Each structure stands twice: as structure tokens, then as C-alpha cells.
Regions:
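Mixed-charge, Lys/Arg-enriched low-complexity segments
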Residues: 2-17, 63-133
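Short, exposed beta-strand/loop patches in secreted or surface proteins that constitute
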Residues: 25-32
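Short, hydrophobic/aromatic-rich segments at coil-to-beta transitions
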Residues: 32-39
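Extended, Lys/Arg-enriched charged tracts that mediate electrostatic binding to polyanionic substrates
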Residues: 20-24
């Protein structure tokens, strides 16, 4: 009689995952069209990232500035949350940027750089800004 251990047959079964519908509403994370964007900085004035939006594709997102490291990533969560909250309230993407400008507070850990609202030809341009050293 062999004492060889056999693997549990359940370990060889395929797992079935059924995608559940629903979840919170989200703006599309991509667009091929032009985007409006805001520059976001920390208290010291160091750029931590960019919030962008395009109404035609119902798209918006947050691009963290890679050179900002973990600190920029952590501070950027606040701005990504603002976009998620705006979408949940049915706010158009560029209107969400306008809210960010209105609610920005220079005394917080990060803020919209005054006068930074700009337009870019595409999302790739903003991603390029975020990837600069």
C-alpha cells in the first residue's frame, strides 16, 4: 500500500466567477478627445498630480505625478474620491473640475493651483505631464 499523498481533487477544479452587475457609478477612465485639466499641488507648492475631464465621453480621472512618490499618491486619493463622489451625484466631468476649483483650500494638504485650468489635445498629454521627472 502506497503512502503517497494525493492532492485534493477540489484544488484542480476551475473556479467560477460571475461578474456582479452594479457597483458605484464611475466616469470612463479614458477618452480620445481633448481634455480639461487642473494642476494639484501640496502645501509647499510641489505638483502632486492632475485631475482631468472630458464631457463628450463622460470621462474623468486623476493622474498622480510619478516624481512625487508615495506622498503624492497618498494625497491624490482625496482628488480621486472627489471625482467618484461627483459622478455619484450625477455631475458632468468638467463641472466636477469646477467644483474642485471652488472647494479648493490652500490650507489643506493639497489644493488646486490657482489659474491652472487648461485644455490639452488628449489624455496622453496629461499623462505625459504626470510622468515627467
Amino acid at each position: 500500500m502506497s503512502r503517497e499523498q494525493r492532492p485534493n481533487p477540489r484544488l484542480n477544479e476551475d473556479l467560477l466567477f460571475n461578474e456582479a452587475p452594479g457597483g458605484p457609478p464611475r466616469y470612463s477612465p479614458m477618452t480620445a478627445g481633448p481634455v480639461h485639466y487642473l494642476t494639484i499641488a501640496d502645501r509647499e507648492g510641489e505638483v502632486i498630480g492632475y485631475a482631468w475631464a472630458n464631457d463628450e465621453d463622460d470621462a474623468a480621472g486623476w493622474e498622480v505625478r510619478k516624481a512625487g512618490g508615495d506622498e503624492a499618491f497618498n494625497k491624490g486619493a482625496r482628488w480621486a474620491r472627489k471625482l467618484h463622489d461627483a459622478k455619484a451625484r450625477g455631475v458632468a466631468p468638467t463641472a466636477a473640475l469646477a467644483e474642485m476649483i471652488q472647494e479648493s483650500d490652500l490650507t489643506k494638504s493639497s489644493h488646486v493651483v490657482p489659474g491652472s485650468l487648461a485644455e490639452a489635445p488628449n489624455l496622453g498629454y496629461v499623462e505625459g505631464l504626470a510622468n515627467q521627472e
